[in-house]
Amino acid sequence: SNQTELSLNNGDSIFFSYETPVAGFASGVGHFKTSTWYSSTTSRHINKYFKHIDSNNITTVDDAFIVSRCNYDLQGVG
């Protein structure tokens, strides 16, 4: 269904719509979603991902924040 949730080693999670990271959960921040509008389909994916979360508890963040969360697992590898 072109939706993937990635669980990171630090307990955070990143939600992807197609291949784009658009939402997730981070300790210290809580639930977050992108401030960028991609498409109506991606918006539906995000809304479905947060179906059981009060919208007042979701922080809107820029894409750089989400990418930095994705890079967490890559730090110290090699």
Model-derived regions: residue spans:
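Terminal leader/tail segments of proteins
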Residues: 1-78
